[in-house]
């Protein structure tokens, strides 16, 4: 979800002012500071990341909501990681065997993307209301039968840590191409 595609001119212009992003880390190249809101011009995750599913998801939301509604996102993501990196009970063990490049990304979140997400979520609640949680994971964990339970655990902990009600704050899961059309990373629909 961090975004790998290089943003083009059409991606960085005419971003609606009502579509905001909160930086979960300092982004000096972009002139963004941690826990501050900005118009959601990519990159939305960290400096050096690209266009992500969040970019156009948020723009579509804004276009389909009343003019007085602002949509804000917090993008905490680590490309190529398994879901265990977002489970605070497993993150340290996961990082102990991870590649150096992944460890370097995790360091930007103080080695806990989950805690970074909670901290940013609490800051966001000072000025807004969390209406949903987005999860988009690529091919990591494909075929892992425990993936749905791992996601459920993280989602329920996130709801608890942020004082949210699951009946009011859905988990929306993006998916790589599913198996019905030849995709090989299909497993999200079972959560």
Language-model regions, residue ranges each:
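Cell-envelope and extracellular/periplasmic
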Residues: 1-191
């Amino acid at each position: 979800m961090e975004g790998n595609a290089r943003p083009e001119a059409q991606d960085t212009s005419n971003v609606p002012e009502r579509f905001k992003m909160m930086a979960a880390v300092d982004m000096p190249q972009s002139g963004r500071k941690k826990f501050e809101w900005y118009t959601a011009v990519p990159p939305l995750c960290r400096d050096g990341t690209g266009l992500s599913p969040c970019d156009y998801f948020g723009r579509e939301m804004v276009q389909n909501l009343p003019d007085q509604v602002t949509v804000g996102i917090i993008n905490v993501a680590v490309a190529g990681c398994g879901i265990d990196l977002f489970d605070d009970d497993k993150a340290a063990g996961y990082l102990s065997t991870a590649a150096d490049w992944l460890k370097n990304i995790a360091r930007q979140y103080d080695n806990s993307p989950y805690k970074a997400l909670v901290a940013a979520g609490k800051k966001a609640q000072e000025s807004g209301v969390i209406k949903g949680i987005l999860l988009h994971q690529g091919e990591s964990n494909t075929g892992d039968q425990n993936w749905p339970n791992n996601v459920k655990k993280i989602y329920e902990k996130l709801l608890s840590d942020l004082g949210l009600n699951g009946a009011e704050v859905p988990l929306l899961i993006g998916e790589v191409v599913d198996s019905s059309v030849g995709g090989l990373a299909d497993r999200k629909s079972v959560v």
